[in-house]
């Protein structure tokens, strides 16, 4: 975590590290059980599912400067979607160009032992799906370390819907502690589609940490990722890739 000076009043803005990279802490929001995220008409809202009441309007998933970065990318030759943050240590992905949406993407993990050394590292291990424009990722995440939503020297899980770094929103389910040796399955399921909008559920089977996201763009890039900050060991690995 760190601070950057904001223009104007000379205040400081706290920057936190999410599974989608760094961003202002004020852009990280909890979506509790019984609520869902709606992206209808390009605006993200927190909705009480039973009553369909709008609880909060967040605005676009990405702020202006992030959308500008996307525009710059679109001016280059078209390439495959890539990591939403440069903190991905290793990853592998698959682009869906079948003409049919991905309706299920699941990964089973056996939670590993604690890291051999403790150097305040923050680890995120996840399967995820991005849209075609680099702008958002939906992801069931296993974490080690202290993240902006909690944690410490133990493993825990949460589901995230995250925009691009620096200015994008990061919406998440509650964080749930888990134990080394446990088998967990992170799943993203297509729950509906209508008029070019798609709805998904990101979840861990058997855990109360679901994150429903409705009426967003299609997610076409499926990826498995290890993301890390704060560890010199992982920086060395990346230098030798």
Whereabouts are the PLM-identified features?
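Exposed, interaction-prone regions of secreted/extracellular proteins
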Residues: 1-241
